[in-house]
């Protein structure tokens, strides 16, 4: 995905208070299978009782960090958080001295895919043969997500839904490593889709039947796509809501305001793809501008922006920020892709990324400044939060291949800080806010006694220096501590292959 000529990009490239707090909960953490052979090799800590001592706690609520705490984990849950001076860990099965380290909630990724985009026969002249395809990354993506600290993820659109459901089953059973998963069904896309691997809806009845079929098979959310009609979207929303399931959307044919009034629960990509002001926008048809014009002409102080944000907040519509997928086209001065991310890619994936990056750099200057649009979207996301809106976060690992699972989630948090949020606010958006949207805020998303022990241990202090969020060493999921580096090393050079 890119800022300039977003529609063309999709059609051609993407086709796409911390004193002593005792445990108040008697119920155990959600049952998970004991780690099997394929999982045990990545387990660094597995004990009935673990105490993280002298650690800095960033609790995910947006509150200031608390230094020198002891966090106790038992039975997959956090059982206490105490000032280290007031606590004794002598009877712990495992004690970790974490001076100089921070612990925060596991990331709740809300726009995380399990596929990768390929352009067949892409060559140095930047030409390729149609169609753009989305091969499944069932092996590499879950390890990358978990290794980077993503302990819960929403797939936010599936191209191999049975594979995603079976992957979730095997992760939950302890057979494979990976995060907790909210499996989104196949894309709810209209007849004009440029993706061969998406269903092409022909009627509202099609939409209803698709939702009901996949809800029966275990899907827990749905995503509408760019060419869906209002009638089809309404049918899908109604069918999902009858099952207690939510619908999000990366829209174009339907405007944000229309979708909110139809009852949608979430809108993807911040404010990049709202088309309500686009010239020549026809009902149920994606505009040529695909939202660029609207973003350019909707500063936060405008009547249109204030009215839209008011509508979204009144209808309890969340917004998913996906800044990394737009960053590559946001002008010069952007940091290069991290070496760890490049190392995760196959040689072919790296080559394709470099070709596509060069094509972007050598393309004629767009009429609308991409850097301005990137900044404008950040301003609108801040205005949405200031108005009481629920902002959640994810990376969208698609585009030209430079948004990598897990690493992209970390980068999203860094970019939220660039957007003007404080580090602890950005961490809340990427943790507790996502849990709140999913209705799981009592189980995950923040560090509190009684909650699941889904935690990230990292060297440094991301509450002051957000880039320290990259220094992940241990990821706890349901109280089991995974070795981040081992997970990442296990898929080095494999992302883009499987």
Each model region followed by its residue ranges:
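Histidine-rich, glycine-flanked metal-binding segment
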Residues: 34-48, 57, 62-104
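Bacterial N-terminal signal peptides
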Residues: 11-23
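Divalent metal-dependent hydrolysis catalytic cores, especially in the metallo-beta-lactamase
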Residues: 138-162, 179-186, 216-228, 246-248, ...
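Histidine-centered divalent metal-coordination motifs
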Residues: 54, 101, 111-115, 250, ...
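Metal-associated gating/positioning segment near the N- to mid-region
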Residues: 102-173, 194, 205, 257-263
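Acidic/histidine-rich helix-loop elements
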Residues: 114-134, 188-204, 276-281, 286-297, ...
